[in-house]
Every structure is written in C-alpha cells, then in structure tokens.
C-alpha cells in the first residue's frame, strides 16, 4: 500500500501539519496538486481540501467566483477518480451543525450561519462532498487517518 502523502505547494499555514507528519514518521512530499490540498500519491480516491477557518469556507462558498472555482475543483477531482472529497475546516470553537447554524462573522455580517449550513448541505447533496470540523492540534492526525482510512 502506498503511504506517501502529497501536500499541495499552494497550501499555506501547514507548518504544524508537516511537523506532525515528521514527528510520526509520515512520508510526504510537497508538489502541485490538480485538486485539493492533500492526497495519497497516485491515489485520487480521497482528496482533502483544508480550510483554515469557517470564515474561509464561507468566503469560498458564498463568493460567486470562488464558488465556481470550488465546483470546478470538485469536478476535476471526480474526473481523476475521487469518490471521497472532504473539506476539513480547522476551527477550535465550532463543534456541531448547531454551532454552524449560530455562527456569525463581523467580516461577512450579511451571511447568517443558518444560510451557510444550507449551502453546505446543498453541496453535500449535489457533489457528495463531506465537511468535517477539526481542531488545529488534531489536523495532522486527522489528515493521516482519513487518507490511510484508519
């Protein structure tokens, strides 16, 4: 079984994740990916797209140009054979759908959490993607577990 993780060169803020990979002996390379931020080398089954905050995800899903880019990225992943596209949202405060529903941001005051949750649910239905909230300290382990299907 192939255990080499590829991390996209455009993925920012991944220093702690790569340090975790080093700590646990997880092999990885940094290389440009066609879709997402993390995957197993030559295995497109599972692709992970990491978001640093729920606000980043909201911006991606609610901005028309960004939303179209995300849709193209998911379509590209599926063309490559991806059957498990996962958005990993790094957030220490959000724990549940109810927390997303009650979410608000001063940066996007017109977007209510309830609307964001509906958009996420529509994406789940339309594109068969998953959304997972993960704490910053657990991000590296979660990426390995999802890609290695532990």
Describe each PLM feature range.
Residues 46-53:
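Conserved catalytic cores of phosphodiester-cleaving nucleases, focusing on short active-site segments
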Residues 1-43, 57-150:
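Non-catalytic C-terminal interaction segments of nucleic acid-processing enzymes
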């Amino acid at each position: 079984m192939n255990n080499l993780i590829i991390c996209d060169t455009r993925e920012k803020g991944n220093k702690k994740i790569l340090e975790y990979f080093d700590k646990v002996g997880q092999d990885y390379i940094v290389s440009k990916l066609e879709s997402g931020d993390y995957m197993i080398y030559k295995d497109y089954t599972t692709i992970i797209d990491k978001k640093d905050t729920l606000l980043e995800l909201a911006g991606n899903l609610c901005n028309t140009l960004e939303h179209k880019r995300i849709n193209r990225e998911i379509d590209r992943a599926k063309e490559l054979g991806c059957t498990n596209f996962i958005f990993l949202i790094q957030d220490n405060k959000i724990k549940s759908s109810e927390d997303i529903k009650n979410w608000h941001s001063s940066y996007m005051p017109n977007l209510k959490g309830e609307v964001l949750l509906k958009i996420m649910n529509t994406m789940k239905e339309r594109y068969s993607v998953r959304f997972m909230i993960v704490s910053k300290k657990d991000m590296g382990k979660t990426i390995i577990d999802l890609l290695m299907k532990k």
